[in-house]
From Swiss-Prot:
Phylogenetic lineage: Bacteria, Pseudomonadati, Campylobacterota, Epsilonproteobacteria, Campylobacterales
Name under which the protein is recorded: Large ribosomal subunit protein bL17
Gene that produces this protein: rplQ
Biological processes per GO annotation: translation
HAMAP family tied to this protein: Ribosomal_bL17
Keyword Ribosomal protein on entry: yes
């Protein structure tokens, strides 16, 4: 049973799940808004908000910490220098999730996740 389990498995192995969240986070940073499944969006929210909180500091160590998760120089630079400073006075709640529609093939709920 999954009682009080800390995260969703998303039907993937741990390495696949880690790669999925990393790629979704990079896409969100590059485009500021993406559409994905509702449960992926909810997991991504936790992942990206932790990174944004670290990136708000804006120093060298923040760059290193964010890069360790994203492994993408452009996305790291954009998060630390452009996106995170906008939230300097905000304690969490950097993203918004809105349910949009149902996927035509399997009728799963889709949602958009975007920076506020």
């Amino acid at each position: 049973m999954r009682h009080k389990h800390g995260y969703r498995k998303l039907g993937r192995t741990s390495s696949h799940r880690k790669a999925l969240l990393k790629n979704l986070a990079i896409a969100l940073i590059e485009h500021n808004k993406i559409e994905t499944g509702i449960y992926k969006a909810k997991e991504l929210r936790s992942y990206i908000e932790k990174l944004t909180t670290v990136a708000r500091v804006g120093d060298f160590n923040a760059h290193r910490h964010v890069f360790a998760y994203l492994q993408n120089k452009e996305a790291t630079h954009k998060l630390v220098t452009e996106i995170a400073p906008k939230y300097a006075q905000r304690n969490g709640g950097y993203t918004r999730i809105q349910r949009t529609t149902f996927r035509r093939g399997d009728a799963s709920t889709l949602a958009t996740i975007e920076f506020v």
